């Protein structure tokens, strides 16, 4: 969605967008929000000011989709290699492991892993344009590009990954 308009001395654009994509694997999706504002103001015959700003936020629910083997197997590799004749859980309610390949995770257990990534970015510029005399324009630009990312991962003890440590949680943050 966007709105544009203005007058002889003011021009503006405001826009926003939302996008959601579900993955082909259960519990895997992505949402993106973006917003943009452009504003230009003619202050006088000699001075123009302007601001352009874009803000985006991406949220992703990840599942193990890597190309590793054994305990690092992706959910697709684990599903392809796991014995389909075994029940999902044993009589104790624990995920069944293949006795001939105990290093291979039960693919259903991988769906219990919580792996969320959130990214935000602000990209902004501002300018001042001055025309002190005919045929001379002075323009100063100022800008910022700010990124933030946070990834939260939880592997419950019911998964092969978390079993070794009684469950594991990690948070990584970049600024």
Each model region followed by its residue ranges:
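An active-site-proximal structural segment forming one wall of the substrate-binding cleft
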Residues: 136
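Transmembrane beta-strand segments that form the barrel wall of outer-membrane beta-barrel proteins
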Residues: 16-22
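A generic beta-sheet turn/junction motif
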Residues: 5-9, 18
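C-terminal intrinsically disordered extensions
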Residues: 120-123, 133
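Surface-exposed loop/interface segments of Gram-negative outer-membrane beta-barrel transport/assembly proteins
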Residues: 1, 23-28, 34, 38-121, ...
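Outer-membrane beta-barrel channels and translocator barrels
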Residues: 7-8, 44, 131-133
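Outer-membrane beta-barrel architecture
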Residues: 2-4, 15, 38, 125-127, ...
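Periplasmic plug
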Residues: 13-15, 50
């Amino acid at each position: 969605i966007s709105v544009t308009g203005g007058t002889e001395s003011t021009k503006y654009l405001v826009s926003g967008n939302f996008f959601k994509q579900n993955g082909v694997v259960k519990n895997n999706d992505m949402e993106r929000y973006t917003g943009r504002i452009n504003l230009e103001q003619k202050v006088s015959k000699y001075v123009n000011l302007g601001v352009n700003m874009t803000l985006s936020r991406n949220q992703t629910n990840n599942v193990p989709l890597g190309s590793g083997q054994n305990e690092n197997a992706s959910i697709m590799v684990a599903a392809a290699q796991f014995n389909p004749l075994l029940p999902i859980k044993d009589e104790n309610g624990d995920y069944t492991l293949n006795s001939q390949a105990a290093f291979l995770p039960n693919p259903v257990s991988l769906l219990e892993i919580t792996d969320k990534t959130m990214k935000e970015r602000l990209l902004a510029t501002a300018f001042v344009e001055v025309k002190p005399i005919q045929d001379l324009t002075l323009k100063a630009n100022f800008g910022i590009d700010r990124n933030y990312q946070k990834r939260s991962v939880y592997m419950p003890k019911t998964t092969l990954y978390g079993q070794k440590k009684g469950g594991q949680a990690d948070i990584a943050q970049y600024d």
